[in-house]
């Protein structure tokens, strides 16, 4: 997610004849039934313990499921299906490995969200929910050994902090240590989390609401995101995607507590392209028409995400910061020894992958605040405060990651859930 500072979704066979059963001793039946019951209980326990494990054990051949394939529907892309097909089939091994890494990350993302979605209930703290998501990611990526590292920047693991933004907060909130916020029945919560494999990031998000009065808000945003996915393609102008998203989003209304609201796009929030180890690659995919004639290009990865709001449709940075990322490139060595030591921890565990303060706590850096603020002031680390619409409003988000192959696009993070 990018905040645009400039503007700052029997046929049944006949049963055979059965002969009369032979008489059986009642004690034998009871004994057999008891044995069978014990076996069933044992089987159930065994199955329950194998719900989450390293994804490599589930796919020993290291070939992961492809995402949803979609044709390019724009006329100027139709010729690519024939002209580029042979070139696609002759792609380098490096390209195929990159795609497989993204499919692996996407499969992990699907399995994590499947494992946590039915567990998230009102009454849970946001910290409990964040731990559910992140521990699941660690399990499936195999980065949970000894609990001593959150991530290995050149391997695989958590791609950025788990966003759990409530109601008018649209993005960039995850609980810091000591946060006691409890999820309530009337809340609308955006769940935005990422998985990376060798730096190739899967960025995907969904919204949870328990009260059915928010259904139309969620439907509007899901429809808008799917519209953005449909419009995306090689040589497509970014402003055209934003225009299509805006038209769909604004066609929805939602009634909340007896008051009707038009669903508005959060006009200064955007999707984005994704580069290795860099969640924001430089291109922004608007969710309103903005006149940006920059085009999407072949083989690029994009996170198509949309945010809908019952408020003003504009967010500002507000509240305690939890999200951080080291800026790419070379930087001067911090003069403060604690900042220098913290930077070493960040380099070793995250690189340019975003992190949060809880991750530093987990690494034993529980007295990091002053050193972290020093790195931010010196321009070495970027801070990403929460992004809020007006209080009393509600925001929703849906997001998928896709690859623009020469002949088709692949929505790698697509699942049965959204």
Curated annotation (Swiss-Prot):
Compositionally biased spans, kind Basic residues: 38-49
Glycosyltransferase found in the keyword field: no
Catalysis performed (reactions): Release of N-terminal amino acids, preferentially methionine, from peptides and arylamides
Enzyme Commission number(s) from the entry: 3.4.11.18
Residues binding substrate: 172, 280
InterPro entries: Creatinase/aminopeptidase-like, Met_Aminopeptidase_Type2, Pept_M24, Pept_M24_MAP, Pept_M24A_MAP2, Pept_M24A_MAP2_BS, WH-like_DNA-bd_sf, WH_DNA-bd_sf
Cofactor info, note text: Binds 2 divalent metal cations per subunit. Has a high-affinity and a low affinity metal-binding site. The true nature of the physiological cofactor is under debate. The enzyme is active with cobalt, zinc, manganese or divalent iron ions. Most likely, methionine aminopeptidases function as mononuclear Fe(2+)-metalloproteases under physiological conditions, and the catalytically relevant metal-binding site has been assigned to the histidine-containing high-affinity site.
Necessary cofactors: Co(2+); Zn(2+); Mn(2+); Fe(2+)
Gene Ontology, cellular component aspect: cytoplasm
GO BP terms, alphabetized: proteolysis
Subcellular location: Cytoplasm
Keyword terms, alphabetized: Aminopeptidase, Cytoplasm, Hydrolase, Metal-binding, Protease
Keyword Metal-binding part of the UniProt annotation: yes
Binding locations of a divalent metal cation 2: 203, 272, 305, 399
Disordered, as annotated region: 18-49
Highest taxon in the source lineage: Eukaryota
GO molecular function annotations of the record: initiator methionyl aminopeptidase activity; metal ion binding; metalloaminopeptidase activity
Binding site for a divalent metal cation 1: 192, 203, 399
PANTHER family linked: METHIONINE AMINOPEPTIDASE 2
Purpose: Cotranslationally removes the N-terminal methionine from nascent proteins. The N-terminal methionine is often cleaved when the second residue in the primary sequence is small and uncharged (Met-Ala-, Cys, Gly, Pro, Ser, Thr, or Val).
Family recorded in the similarity comment: Belongs to the peptidase M24A family. Methionine aminopeptidase eukaryotic type 2 subfamily.
Annotated protein name in UniProt: Methionine aminopeptidase 2
Source organism of the structure: Kluyveromyces lactis (strain ATCC 8585 / CBS 2359 / DSM 70799 / NBRC 1267 / NRRL Y-1140 / WM37) (Yeast)
UniProt gene name: MAP2
